[in-house]
């Protein structure tokens, strides 16, 4: 991208697989850049490290065998968690909470958050604002990704998560 004109000059793929890749979520940790793209057709969720010197990605860890879609990793609740919908109902009303198994390192489903409508699928990274946690979500009532909604997220005393749409 030309920073003066904001025009796209060139594109170079950094990760190419024989299966579908999308939703390239990015983590930055201790000077490293990690990417975990949606790739349920490839058999689950994998973590890649982006190597700027070669402009490519190297697979470093298999995170989950679940066929997660638009997964979001967060530590906003004091522990590493992944929130995601899952095939075959990726655009539905159930958001899975995945926790890391300490012995295997894999993320496993530990909770399901059920909505009354198809708004479970993530639409980007979660964020904080004025001490509250928010998540962008896709409203797929009409069709996949028809609208974007923002939900305030809280972890209740019983450990379950609650979501409230904000306007």
What is the predicted function of each stretch?
Residues 1-167:
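Carbohydrate-active catalytic/glycan-binding domains of CAZyme proteins
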């Amino acid at each position: 991208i030309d920073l003066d004109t904001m025009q796209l000059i060139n594109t170079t793929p950094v990760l190419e697989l024989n299966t579908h890749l999308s939703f390239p979520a990015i983590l930055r940790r201790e000077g490293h850049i990690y990417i975990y793209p949606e790739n349920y057709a490839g058999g689950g969720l994998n973590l890649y490290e982006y190597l700027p010197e070669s402009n490519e990605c190297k697979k470093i860890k298999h995170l989950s065998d679940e066929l997660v879609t638009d997964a979001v990793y967060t530590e906003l609740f004091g522990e590493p968690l992944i929130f995601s919908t899952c095939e075959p109902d990726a655009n539905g009303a159930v958001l899975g909470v995945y926790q890391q198994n300490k012995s295997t390192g894999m993320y496993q489903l530990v909770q399901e958050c059920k909505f009354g409508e198809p708004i479970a699928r993530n639409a980007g990274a979660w964020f904080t604002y004025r001490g509250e946690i928010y998540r962008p979500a896709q409203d797929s009532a009409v069709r996949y990704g028809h609208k974007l909604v923002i939900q305030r997220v809280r972890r209740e005393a019983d450990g379950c998560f609650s979501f409230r749409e904000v306007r």
